[in-house]
């Protein structure tokens, strides 16, 4: 099934790229971004639609948890709407920031109402009872995961490789705990096929259709499996990218000074002269090492 999903995506992506080029479904580059990205304007976007839809298909075949599939669907709708508006308006805006945040919060709220999770958290082996505060915590985890992957999607291949380098070790970790969340692998191989066409120079971008969905799935899975804190160890790069934005905005508002040349962090490295390939390679290796160290610490390997 995993191999079939990979091959199906590998076969369909060239067709999708041709279709999107013909329909002029292309990326509009935001003006605030690095000048280096100007040549990417017009590259087909919304490529995440394929690995998400095949993820649904194989997820249903593998009898994936219904709540995970529902979460995937809700965040897919948000990402798709954002990309659709951007393409329709012929600019990079799509949904406004507050609109996207409201929709993500609503999606997470719906998920929590349906999941009705226990209100305790596993803090690396210690159980902490949070009571009603847990729902706010879980809301932040799901919305934060979705946004973190979205922020990471700024260079050719970056978000895809980060997802693969974290989701596969995370799957092994959950398997060791007796939890089967095969949707992580199903999406992972779909993303691998996508990366054949997304690595620099990218022939297609995943868009928010892909990145928001991937992050939403990760957050939902972590809440369902009570591994919210562990998730951070497998996705250190998205966490760092998010922190870089928070620090940059906070520093500028309070001290009128910027910490980085530009945020998220990958743009800072671009502006100090690193190539996209180098940034993607270094970030991916860092995330993979963090994931493998986590597996070693918790006795999954070694």
From Swiss-Prot:
GO terms for cellular component: plasma membrane. Its EC number is 2.7.8.13. The keyword Lyase does not apply. It catalyses: UDP-N-acetyl-alpha-D-muramoyl-L-alanyl-gamma-D-glutamyl-meso-2,6-diaminopimeloyl-D-alanyl-D-alanine + di-trans,octa-cis-undecaprenyl phosphate = di-trans,octa-cis-undecaprenyl diphospho-N-acetyl-alpha-D-muramoyl-L-alanyl-D-glutamyl-meso-2,6-diaminopimeloyl-D-alanyl-D-alanine + UMP. Its cofactor is Mg(2+). Pfam families: Glycos_transf_4, MraY_sig1. InterPro entries: Glycosyl_transferase_4, PNAcMuramoyl-5peptid_Trfase, PNAcMuramoyl-5peptid_Trfase_CS. It is found in: Cell inner membrane. GO terms for biological process: cell division; cell wall macromolecule biosynthetic process; cell wall organization; peptidoglycan biosynthetic process; regulation of cell shape. One of its GO terms (molecular function) is phospho-N-acetylmuramoyl-pentapeptide-transferase activity. Pathway: Cell wall biogenesis; peptidoglycan biosynthesis. PANTHER family: PHOSPHO-N-ACETYLMURAMOYL-PENTAPEPTIDE-TRANSFERASE, PHOSPHO-N-ACETYLMURAMOYL-PENTAPEPTIDE-TRANSFERASE HOMOLOG. Catalyzes the initial step of the lipid cycle reactions in the biosynthesis of the cell wall peptidoglycan: transfers peptidoglycan precursor phospho-MurNAc-pentapeptide from UDP-MurNAc-pentapeptide onto the lipid carrier undecaprenyl phosphate, yielding undecaprenyl-pyrophosphoryl-MurNAc-pentapeptide, known as lipid I. HAMAP family: MraY. NCBIfam families: mraY. Belongs to the glycosyltransferase 4 family. MraY subfamily. This is Phospho-N-acetylmuramoyl-pentapeptide-transferase.
């Amino acid at each position: 099934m995993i191999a079939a999903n990979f091959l199906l995506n590998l076969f369909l992506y060239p067709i999708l790229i041709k279709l999107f080029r013909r329909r002029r479904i292309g990326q509009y580059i935001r003006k605030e971004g690095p000048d280096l990205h100007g040549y990417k304007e017009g590259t087909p976007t919304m490529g995440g639609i394929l690995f998400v839809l095949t993820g649904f298909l194989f997820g249903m075949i593998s009898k994936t948890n219904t709540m995970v599939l529902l979460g995937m669907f809700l965040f897919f709708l948000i990402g798709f709407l954002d990309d659709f508006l951007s393409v329709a308006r012929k600019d990079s805006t799509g949904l406004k920031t507050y609109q996207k945040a409201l929709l993500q919060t609503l999606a997470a709220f719906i998920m929590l109402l349906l999941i009705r999770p226990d209100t305790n958290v596993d803090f690396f082996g210690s159980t902490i009872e949070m009571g009603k505060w847990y729902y706010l915590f879980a809301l932040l985890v799901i919305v934060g995961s979705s946004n973190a992957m979205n922020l990471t999607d700024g260079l050719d291949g970056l978000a895809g490789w980060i997802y693969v380098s974290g989701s596969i070790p995370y799957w092994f970790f959950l398997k060791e705990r007796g939890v089967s969340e095969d949707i992580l692998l199903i999406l992972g191989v779909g993303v691998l096929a996508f990366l054949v066409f997304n690595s620099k120079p990218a022939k297609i971008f995943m868009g928010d259709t892909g990145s928001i969905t991937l992050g939403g799935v990760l957050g939902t899975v972590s809440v369902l499996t009570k591994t919210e804190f562990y998730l951070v160890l497998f996705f250190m790069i998205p966490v760092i990218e998010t922190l870089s934005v928070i620090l940059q905005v906070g520093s500028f508002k309070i001290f009128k000074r910027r910490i980085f040349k530009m945020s998220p962090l990958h743009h800072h490295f671009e502006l100090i002269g690193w190539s996209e390939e180098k940034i993607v390679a270094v970030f991916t290796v860092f995330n993979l090492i963090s994931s493998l160290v986590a597996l070693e610490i918790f006795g999954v390997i070694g």
